[in-house]
A protein has these predicted regions:
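N-terminal ligand-binding lobe of clamshell/alpha-beta domains
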Residues: 1-262
Length: 262
């Protein structure tokens, strides 16, 4: 079976479980693992491109992600190509995605081992966070910003990772919405009112600018700004709903919150 995988998350899983030879093509936005960009043909962008390039690699199955690729899925189905659409938005759903990929390619045992390793990392992080909370007696309040204009707060899996790492997402009430538009702050002063101890920026596609955040009108009294507690985590790590958010994003969150607890 030759699969064509459209998302970086699915490509990462296939490489990790040793099934990369099944990959017939990737999107131009695939970044993990780095060797995929060298070894696999790029046959599509993420939401646009020439569907004939996908058909040219003769895939037996195409994996897509979310409503963002609904048009691609429709066109492929109309062309007679089987499509499996993922829509993972939480840590549990991400682990389920790994398991499902394993079943789809006949490598369920290897996928389950990968899930077990990720679950072990989560358990270890919870233990470290619990020890820190026991010492300090508190969870740092975190404002996570995934875009600056307008201000967009953390998506669900990021909010969950913040909690696992021992923090408190100050906009956890918004995190359940899969749509970014539902996580836009109508008034940036909402951040001031919720007084985060730590600000973490992950502006998708561009560098986080802490000096710009600190200079926002009315933000000078925010504890994170007063104490210079502004950090960046690269969007390719933390805003990817795949294994990398757990294996690399979670340790970075732990490190940031460890620093702020000292």
């Amino acid at each position: 079976m030759r699969e064509k995988f459209t998302g970086s998350e699915t490509v990462e899983v296939l490489y990790t479980i040793g099934e990369q030879d099944r990959i017939a093509g990737i999107t131009g936005y695939t970044v993990r693992p780095p060797e995929a960009r060298k070894e696999k043909p790029k046959v599509y962008a993420f939401t646009s491109g020439d569907i004939d390039k996908i058909l040219a690699v003769k895939p037996d199955l195409v994996l897509t992600f979310s409503d963002l690729q609904a048009d691609i899925a429709r066109d492929l189905i109309n062309a007679g190509v089987p499509v499996y659409a993922f829509n993972q938005r939480s840590i549990d759903e991400t682990l389920g995605m790994v398991e499902t990929i394993g079943r789809l390619v006949g490598a369920e045992d290897k996928a389950l081992r990968m899930v077990a390793e990720l679950e072990a990392q989560i358990a270890a992080a919870k233990g470290l966070a619990a020890a820190r909370i026991a010492r300090s007696g508190r969870r740092p309040r975190v404002y996570f910003e995934e875009w600056d204009e307008p201000n967009i707060t953390a998506v669900r899996w990021v909010s969950e990772l913040i909690e696992i790492a021992g923090g408190e997402n100050i906009f956890a009430d918004r995190a359940a919405s899969p749509l970014a538009r539902d996580r836009i702050l109508a008034d940036p002063l909402e951040v001031v009112a919720r007084a985060p101890d730590v600000i973490i920026g992950s502006w998708c596609g561009k560098h986080f600018r802490p000096e710009r955040v600190s200079a926002r009108p009315g933000w000078s009294t925010v504890p994170a700004v007063v104490h210079g507690r502004l950090h960046e985590i690269k969007s390719a790590i933390i805003l990817t709903p795949g294994p990398v958010a757990i294996s690399e994003g979670l340790p970075l969150l732990l490190d940031i919150l460890d620093i702020e607890a000292r």
